Amino acid sequence: MSKHDSVDRDRRALLAAGGAMLGSALWPAGALAQASGAKIPIGTIGAGHIGSTIGGLWVKNGHKVFLSDRHPDELKGLVGELGPLAQAGPIDQAIAFGEAILLTVPYGAIPQIGHDYSAQLKGKVVLDTCNAVAARDGAIADEVEQNGIGVTTQKYFPGVRIVRAFNTLGYTIFAQEANRPDPKLAVPIAGDDPEAVRIAAGLVRDAGFEPVVVGKLADAKLFQRGAPGYGQKVTAAELKQKLSLTQ
């Protein structure tokens, strides 16, 4: 090999390394982790049926999960069942822990949680599973009916990267159908931030399902409670057909 060839080889290696470093600088840590298939830490706000079920599926897939709710001491038994990748504590600690957050509370609590934690959640990917129920949640259910649930959640969480997900089926179905043989159970998702949607899609797959990107947060009304995409225990191809999605 000539000296000139050696210099060219070293130059190409340096350029490749520099490009990788630049790419790392431009991508959020969580996005890089998801792109490489690595497991990111996840926090939950709420640890009821959906929170504990989806959180447990992520633990089984190798994610570290920090569960939180109003009474974290009551989660000790659940943490013991899930094993060393799971822990529990206050909401603020779960938010600090997670590169992504699962939001799973009664929808009537959304305004207060947004008021209390939006600043800490700013810039994070938040998977919103919550459904508005008029008899339980009051006036905010009317707001959801008028404006759509995705847009309404985003209103109360300014600066947060909201993605709607895991809201269409009950926890027992998620528990039973996770990681079934192909074709997997479809989980519709929607969000305004493309990178947040991509990360959420990866987390849906890690839980054992097939994500179906429906569109922006305004399009989440297509699978909110009572809409055509709600309650659909179907494959991705079937869900796309039901919602007239072209992709």
Residue ranges, per PLM feature:
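Rossmann-fold NAD(P)-binding glycine/threonine-rich loop
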Residues: 130-162
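Conserved N-terminal Rossmann-fold NAD(P) cofactor-binding segment
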Residues: 36-39, 60-100, 104-112, 116-120
